[in-house]
């Protein structure tokens, strides 16, 4: 599960971010532009509820629209995290999304699931209606 946060949407980075995942060879299975309410944001970030930055994070996520996405492909969670970069943009390498587009940890452009199990939970939360089932005609060009 990948979410472009309000700063990424406001700054017009949606196309660039989608392009990076597509160019890597991943398939887009779900996409929605949505503004979430506080209760939904709190549910999404429930694992961080005891952290001192929790309320600020929730306020930030509800401050504008986000783009929620589901990507599929071999190693998509681990590779997605590498494409995104470190949580703290100052620790992110150039060439990563956060390394190229973010400065502050509190405005780091994008969220990516940290594990396959987290991705399953987040996809169920954000896409209760399910995702598109299709396979790119380029699949055989990307995978053995």
Curated annotation (Swiss-Prot):
Entries under InterPro entries matching the protein: NDK-like_dom (IPR034907), NDK-like_dom_sf (IPR036850), Nucleoside_diP_kinase (IPR001564), Nucleoside_diP_kinase_AS (IPR023005)
Reported function: Major role in the synthesis of nucleoside triphosphates other than ATP. The ATP gamma phosphate is transferred to the NDP beta phosphate via a ping-pong mechanism, using a phosphorylated active-site intermediate.
Entry-linked PROSITE patterns: NDPK (PS00469), NDPK_LIKE (PS51374)
Keyword Flavoprotein: no
Class of enzymatic activity (EC top level): transferase
Catalysed conversion reaction: a 2'-deoxyribonucleoside 5'-diphosphate + ATP = a 2'-deoxyribonucleoside 5'-triphosphate + ADP; a ribonucleoside 5'-diphosphate + ATP = a ribonucleoside 5'-triphosphate + ADP
Protein name in UniProt: Nucleoside diphosphate kinase
Cysteine pairings via disulfide bonds: none
NCBIfam families: PRK00668.1
Family listed: Belongs to the NDK family.
Recorded GO MF terms: ATP binding; metal ion binding; nucleoside diphosphate kinase activity
Keywords: ATP-binding, Kinase, Magnesium, Metal-binding, Nucleotide metabolism, Nucleotide-binding, Phosphoprotein, Transferase
Gene Ontology BP terms: CTP biosynthetic process; GTP biosynthetic process; UTP biosynthetic process
Active site: 111 (pros-phosphohistidine intermediate)
């Amino acid at each position: 599960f990948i979410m472009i946060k309000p700063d990424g949407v406001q700054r017009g980075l949606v196309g660039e971010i989608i392009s990076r995942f597509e160019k890597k060879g991943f398939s887009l299975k779900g996409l929605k532009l949505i503004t979430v309410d506080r209760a939904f944001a709190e549910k999404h970030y429930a694992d961080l509820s005891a952290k001192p930055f929790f309320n600020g994070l929730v306020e930030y996520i509800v401050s504008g629209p986000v783009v929620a996405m589901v990507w599929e492909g071999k190693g998509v969670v681990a590779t997605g995290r590498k494409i995104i970069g470190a949580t703290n943009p100052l620790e992110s390498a150039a060439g990563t999304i956060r390394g190229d587009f973010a400065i502050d940890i509190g405005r780091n452009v994008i969220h990516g699931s940290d594990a396959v199990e987290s991705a399953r939970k987040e996809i169920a939360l954000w896409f209760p209606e399910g995702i598109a089932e299709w396979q790119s005609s380029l699949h055989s060009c990307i995978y053995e």
